[in-house]
Regions:
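Conserved SAM/AdoMet-binding glycine-rich loop
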Residues: 60-64, 69, 181-264
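Proteins enriched for Cys/Gly/acidic motifs involved in redox and nucleic-acid/cofactor modification
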Residues: 1-198, 242, 248, 252
């Protein structure tokens, strides 16, 4: 999911006129973080040290789960950091970088969880409002929800990604069609717990199994996958989709840290 977020930010920056450059030549540096890896905070601070050594004049932004945890402390410890964004700070990041380049003293933080899914569809359009002419891609990843309400003892996700929020069905389908039109025959639907898609207050009445049906109906789409699926919320109807939809690959990704009750 973080990789997908980072790729989206890169595309959105390119659509605003940015060009990818080596670290030493960059005007802005975007660091997206993950808090479920070993020693995540130390790795972020190490990365910031390397950036400062290589390019002390660059505008640096830090986003993702570690940014959500540490917050404004990142700016205090590293003055070069001028943007901090949590899970809901990804969407405003591209426009924030444009502002930061034009306002040298400005610092921005987006650490509050928004009251709706932070949709990014407008960034798939060019300046004329037409679909952006991105390159052909055989595989695509589409966010359908984010956050989690399960609060498992071993998991930090509810604190770093916030409460669960479903994206609108139409928005999901529009992005899937966008990628299929650009050559994607294989789409993975992303979320911290895709099984509860549509069941929160942001849902529009479409369940996850029904969403799978609608995505599978898109002409040209050959394979569908999804991650992650919490076993507590896995319904029989979702299981039945593996038999009903030939496009749905026989693959499950479950957020299991251990099979031992005593260990958990």
């Amino acid at each position: 999911m973080n990789v997908n977020d980072s790729q989206w930010v890169a595309r959105a920056l390119e659509q605003r006129g940015f060009v990818e450059k080596p670290l030493e030549e960059a005007d802005v540096v975007f660091i997206n973080t993950c808090s479920v890896r070993e020693k995540p905070e130390q790795k972020v601070y190490s990365a910031l040290g390397r950036v400062h050594q290589a390019n002390p004049r660059a505008v640096v932004g830090v986003a993702g789960c570690v940014a959500q945890q540490i917050g404004a402390e990142l700016m205090r410890r590293h003055p070069q950091v001028r943007f901090v964004g949590g899970a809901d700070g990804i969407a405003p990041a591209p426009d924030a970088f444009v502002r930061l380049l034009h306002e040298p003293k400005l610092r921005l933080s987006y650490l509050d969880f928004t009251d709706s899914f932070p949709d990014r569809d407008p960034y798939l359009l060019d300046a004329a409002g037409q679909p952006a002419q991105e390159g052909v891609t055989p595989v695509a990843y589409v966010n359908i929800m984010q956050g989690c309400d399960n609060f498992c003892a071993y998991c930090i996700v509810p604190f770093t990604r916030g409460p669960r929020k479903s994206r609108s069905t139409q928005s999901v389908l529009d992005e899937c069609r966008h990628w299929v039109a650009r050559g994607a025959g294989d789409i993975t639907l992303l979320g911290q717990n895709v099984n509860v898609f549509g069941k929160d207050k942001y849902g529009d009445g479409t369940s996850f199994p029904e969403l799978l049906r609608q995505v599978a109906a898109i002409p040209g789409l050959r394979r569908i996958r999804f991650v992650s699926a919490h076993p507590r919320d896995f319904s029989q109807e979702t299981i039945d989709m593996f038999a009903e939809l030939p496009q749905l690959m026989p693959r499950l990704h479950l957020p299991l840290q251990s099979g031992s009750d005593s260990m958990l």
